[in-house]
């Protein structure tokens, strides 16, 4: 008797892969269940910008053939996943959530896409996002908003909103997103899934549409800590096509996963719990910290004194880099081209006017101003100095602890439309996540319960030393094992 499609969709990533390997279920069954789930739910969720049904079915058929021969590429072989529409995919539209790339068909795959497919994972589609990854609510998508599976009137977070919503809703077993200032961890927290921002340089950015090149990083989202660890192990490692890619060997993330929290020193920054948090979020975070103490970890008071300047530094550095990266979208080589322009300069201007949304334009203006003659030293250079101080704060804190723990966001998922008219309020959603990017450190969001008042998920943020993702996974798994999984969100 076959397993109902809905049950297949709620299987963990490793559980689904093991089922394919044991021939208890087929990759074709998993993929058809995923496609049916997307068809049934995405009209309300809006998590997908493109569904690659034919490509996915062909990949599933190949995975089943390998299973029949007793071959297995990896634990991911035959399992449906999806990727943010920021990763180029050969022959599949890649828009970065922007009109200016509407209809663009890349001639090659991003490195992380190559690595997923080499491991046998089946990519079923491309996921919704804020335009060029600029946003914290997925409302900046040029195509449609994405909704939170826990409450369709609320944001899933951004910019990787589709990546989190698709996993939480059981459309796929895992996904990839990008994180420039919190864009994996915030949606993961809002949607009640695990989201990982690796150390800068741990995962190749080749084939990822650039936002802020010194901050962008690729990472996984999944419903279980171990599943996220497996995906990261699959995509991590040196890539000669990305000059920022580290040559450091990839650690075994799964080996220490079940070692527990006993003996861990968990740093708690006093600046992160000193105000500005909604009461329900603070209660959930403090309860999670108490759980670590109960499990044998030692809570250590640490200070990150320059973290209060993180928002200001980030919103100078990131727009400055974006203003350069987005200069290539001019209507000449690919994407939207304005018709009827009387000359080259007018065509440039009209193509960008028609193709770019309000948030990219705002950040291009901010970045161009910060880099302009007479203002570079006062703004951009000073922001980079603050970045150095933030990195030193973390170095000092890690002298006395193994991981740092605190909130991901000041609140649970907020209502769609609530902050679109106030960019500053939107930017403040990233207040706890931005410093991790500025310091190039690994960070992770793991569910730590539901807020009592709203019943919405709360995420605990864990930050680690450079390239010590293994300790983050160990600490996150200890909490996950003790608290148990969150219930599935309501049916859309």
UniProtKB/Swiss-Prot annotation:
Any one Gene Ontology BP term: translation
SUPFAM superfamilies assigned to the protein according to its UniProt record, in alphabetical order: Amidase signature (AS) enzymes
Family annotation (Pfam families): Amidase
Key words, A-Z: ATP-binding, Ligase, Nucleotide-binding, Protein biosynthesis
GO CC annotation, single: glutamyl-tRNA(Gln) amidotransferase complex
Active site residues according to the UniProt entry: 84 (charge relay system), 159 (charge relay system), 183 (acyl-ester intermediate)
EC number(s) per entry: 6.3.5.7
Reaction equation(s) it catalyzes: L-glutamyl-tRNA(Gln) + L-glutamine + ATP + H2O = L-glutaminyl-tRNA(Gln) + L-glutamate + ADP + phosphate + H(+)
GO MF annotation terms: ATP binding; glutaminyl-tRNA synthase (glutamine-hydrolyzing) activity
InterPro entries the record matches: Amidase, Amidase_CS, Amidase_dom, AS_sf, GatA
Enzyme class, first EC level, given as a word: ligase
Subunit structure, interactors included: Heterotrimer of A, B and C subunits.
Function of the molecule: Allows the formation of correctly charged Gln-tRNA(Gln) through the transamidation of misacylated Glu-tRNA(Gln) in organisms which lack glutaminyl-tRNA synthetase. The reaction takes place in the presence of glutamine and ATP through an activated gamma-phospho-Glu-tRNA(Gln).
Recorded family membership: Belongs to the amidase family. GatA subfamily.
Cross-referenced NCBIfam families: gatA
Record's protein name: Glutamyl-tRNA(Gln) amidotransferase subunit A
Lineage: Bacteria, Pseudomonadati, Myxococcota, Myxococcia, Myxococcales
Gene giving rise to this polypeptide: gatA
């Amino acid at each position: 008797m076959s397993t109902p499609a809905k049950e297949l969709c709620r299987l963990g990533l490793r559980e689904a892969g093991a089922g394919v390997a044991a021939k208890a279920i087929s990759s074709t069954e998993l993929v058809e269940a995923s496609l049916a789930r997307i068809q049934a739910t995405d009209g309300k969720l809006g998590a997908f910008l493109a569904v690659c049904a034919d490509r996915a079915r062909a990949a599933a058929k190949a995975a089943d053939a390998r299973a029949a021969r007793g071959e297995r590429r990896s634990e991911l072989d035959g399992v449906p996943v999806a990727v943010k529409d920021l990763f180029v995919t050969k022959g599949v539209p890649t828009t970065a959530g922007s009109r200016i790339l509407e209809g663009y068909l890349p001639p090659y795959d991003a490195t992380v896409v190559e690595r997923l497919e080499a491991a046998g994972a089946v990519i079923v589609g491309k996921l919704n996002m804020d335009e060029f990854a600029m946003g914290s609510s997925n409302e900046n998508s040029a195509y449609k908003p994405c909704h939170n599976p826990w409450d369709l009137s609320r944001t899933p977070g951004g910019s990787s909103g589709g990546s989190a919503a698709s996993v939480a809703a059981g459309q796929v077993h895992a996904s990839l997103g990008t994180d420039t200032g919190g864009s994996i961890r915030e949606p993961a927290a809002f949607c009640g899934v695990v989201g990982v921002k690796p150390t800068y340089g741990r995962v190749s950015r080749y084939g990822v549409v650039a936002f802020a090149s010194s901050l962008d990083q690729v990472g996984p989202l999944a419903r279980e800590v171990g599943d996220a660890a497996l995906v990261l192990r699959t995509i991590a490692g040196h890539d000669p096509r990305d000059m920022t890619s580290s040559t450091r060997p990839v650690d075994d993330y799964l080996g220490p996963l079940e070692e527990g929290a006993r003996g861990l020193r968990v740093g708690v920054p006093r600046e992160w719990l000193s105000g500005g948090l909604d009461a329900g979020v603070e209660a959930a975070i403090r309860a999670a910290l108490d759980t670590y103490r109960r499990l044998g970890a030692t809570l250590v008071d640490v200070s990150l004194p320059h973290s209060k300047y993180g928002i200001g530094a980030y919103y100078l550095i990131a727009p400055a880099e974006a203003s350069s990266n987005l200069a290539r979208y001019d209507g000449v080589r690919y994407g939207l081209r304005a018709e009827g322009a009387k000359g080259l300069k007018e065509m440039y201007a009209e193509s960008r006017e028609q193709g770019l949304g309000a948030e990219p334009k705002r950040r291009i203006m901010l970045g161009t101003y910060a880099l302009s003659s007479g203002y570079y030293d006062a703004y951009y250079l000073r922001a980079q100095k603050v970045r150095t101080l933030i990195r030193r704060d973390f170095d000092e804190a890690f002298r006395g602890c193994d991981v740092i723990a605190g909130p991901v966001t000041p609140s649970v998922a907020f209502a769609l439309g609530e902050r679109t008219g106030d960019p500053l309020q939107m930017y403040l959603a990233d207040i706890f996540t931005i410093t991790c990017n500025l310091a190039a450190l690994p960070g992770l969001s793991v569910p730590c319960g539901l807020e009592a008042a709203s019943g919405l998920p709360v995420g605990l943020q864990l930050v680690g030393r450079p390239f010590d993702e293994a300790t983050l996974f160990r600490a996150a798994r200890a909490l996950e094992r003790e608290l148990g999984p969150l219930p599935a969100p309501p049916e859309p």
